[in-house]
Amino acid sequence: MKKLLLIVSIFYGTLTFAQDKGYFFGGFESNTQWLLNDEGLNFDAPKDQLRSNNYFRLDYNLGKLTAGVQYESYLPSALLGYSPKFDGNNDIGTYYLNFKHNTIDITAGYFYQQFGNGLILRSWEDRQLGINNALKGIRVIFTPTDYLDLTGIYGKTRNGFDV
C-alpha cells in the first residue's frame, strides 16, 4: 500500500506543476502455459496445469521528468523454470522517477545499468528466462562533454519482489 501511495503522489506532483501536458505510455505482456501429460517425453503435468506470467507497465513523461511503475502477476503459478518466490504472487515489481537535463541524468527507484560489455556490472531483464536483477537505489550520470560520462550508482539487486 505504501508503494502505491508513493507512485500516486509522484504522478500527482508532476501533474500539479505541469505547464505543458504530459503523456502516458506503457504496455502489457502475458506469457501463459497450459501443461499436458506427454508419455513420449515421460512428462506428467503438475496439478496446476495453467501457469501465467503477466506484466503491466505504465510510464508518464512530462518534460524532463519521467515516472513509471511495473505491476507483475504470477497467478495461479509462475511458468516452469521460474524461481518459486514468484509462485502465486502479484505486486508492484519496479518503479522509478527520472530527471534528465542537458548534462545530468538522475534516476531514483529501480533502474538497469551496464558498464562496458557487462563484465564489471550488468543489470537487465529477460522475461522469457525469468531474469530481472534491476538495481533499487539511485543513479546519477553526469556528461560534461560528448565523449565523457561519469556515472555514480548506489543500490541493491532485486531478488523476487524484494531487494
Predicted features, each with a name:
Residues 20-163:
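Outer-membrane beta-barrel channel domains
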Residues 1-25:
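Bacterial Sec-dependent N-terminal signal peptides
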